[in-house]
């Protein structure tokens, strides 16, 4: 294997030395790609032909604090944190996913500076960030999870997070969202919209609810609502369920309601998709799942009413980048639901395809 920083001459030497056609590129135990002889020939041909690839535009950022734990995971979660009041709850979710998938966690604290300032030259106070990161490191040690921490000075939050995703080869981005309505025309807020549109890895957006909602709802009876329209978007959300369920004891799992919204004009709605999804989910998690077909002209309103009437503690939604960013006639459905309910809402957007 070779590291991502290896020179092409070193790669070519190894290919010739061991008579190989390709080599895995690894960062620690994580496979980040494959390099072949064809790749090397293509780069050499481009250089001989005068083809120059312009570097990607990036906003300057500067690392002022960093810790590293053993690189023992098969992947990495990037967890940007800023608010001490929500950091622990977000870390609980990230830790549950890390245990389930054998991932490490990168905790990132960003400090913003004006556009005209150089992040490398501005004096910043890192005490608050280091205090917060130390708290998460203690939680990680208690749970035997490999955690890395970093404080970066950036001019733009979204650009700083995207740069970290590229540098750390992140497999998953988990970020919090306050649920507040943007005044700039953005759906979730400018930085979050940018990350939903551009982050190449799987992305999970978490709007935390009140203190009695997930993941702090273990001392009461609770209902988790999973609205679905079927297809790959639903599978993304359902794939997260085993990780989330691991936060509660097996004897005290929440009730799972799998709901699908049907148009009132459908006299005989096709329930087969809902039934198949219910059966596969029950088999995967070995727990009862309640199928819930609902007639409504407004999917968002139907979900909101159900959450309020049944006091759900979590709503789990799967969505594509397009459905998260496109403004529908009645507004963006996931953001409408997330803003209207008091419980925790988790939105899952899959990895972007090339």
Predicted features and spans:
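Non-catalytic interaction/regulatory modules that flank or connect domains
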Residues: 76-142, 146, 154
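A short, acidic, amphipathic alpha-helical segment used as a generic capping/interface helix at domain edges
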Residues: 272-279, 295-311
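Acidic, proline/glycine-rich short linear motifs
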Residues: 109-131, 251, 257-277
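The conserved cystathionine-beta-synthase
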Residues: 2-19, 26, 84-85
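Charged helix-capping and loop-helix junction motifs
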Residues: 188-191, 273-275, 329-334
């Amino acid at each position: 294997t070779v590291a991502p920083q290896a020179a092409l001459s070193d790669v070519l030497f190894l290919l010739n030395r061991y008579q190989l056609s390709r080599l895995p590129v690894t960062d620690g135990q994580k496979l980040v790609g494959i390099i072949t002889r064809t790749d090397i020939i293509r780069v050499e041909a481009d250089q001989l032909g005068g083809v120059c690839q312009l570097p990607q535009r990036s906003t300057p950022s500067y690392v002022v604090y960093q810790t590293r734990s053993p690189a023992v995971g098969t992947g990495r979660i990037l967890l940007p944190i800023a608010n001490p009041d929500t950091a622990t709850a977000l870390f609980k979710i990230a830790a549950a996913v890390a245990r389930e998938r054998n991932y490490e966690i990168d905790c990132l604290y960003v400090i913003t500076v004006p556009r005209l300032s150089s992040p490398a030259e501005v004096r910043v106070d890192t005490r608050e960030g280091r205090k917060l990161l130390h708290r998460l490191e203690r939680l990680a040690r208690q749970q035997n999870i490999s955690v890395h921490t970093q404080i970066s000075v950036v001019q733009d939050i979204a650009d700083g997070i995207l740069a970290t995703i590229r540098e750390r080869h992140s497999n998953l981005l988990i970020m919090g969202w306050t649920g507040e309505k943007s005044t700039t025309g953005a759906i979730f807020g400018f930085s979050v919209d940018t990350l939903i549109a551009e982050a190449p890895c799987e992305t999970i957006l978490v709007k935390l609810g009140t203190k009695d909602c997930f993941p702090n709802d273990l001392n009461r009876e609770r209902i988790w609502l999973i609205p679905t329209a079927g297809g790959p978007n639903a599978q993304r959300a359902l794939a997260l369920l085993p990780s989330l369920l691991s936060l509660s004891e097996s004897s005290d799992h929440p009730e799972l309601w799998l709901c699908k919204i049907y148009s009132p004009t459908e006299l005989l709605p096709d329930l087969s998709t809902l039934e198949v999804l219910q059966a596969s989910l029950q088999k995967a998690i070995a727990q009862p799942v309640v199928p819930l077909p609902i007639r409504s002209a407004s999917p968002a309103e139907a979900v909101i009413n159900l959450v309020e009437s049944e006091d759900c503690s979590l709503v789990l939604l799967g969505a594509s980048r397009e459905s998260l960013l496109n403004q529908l006639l009645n507004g963006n459905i996931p953001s409408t639901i997330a803003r209207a309910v008091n419980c925790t809402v988790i939105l899952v957007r899959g990895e972007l395809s090339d």
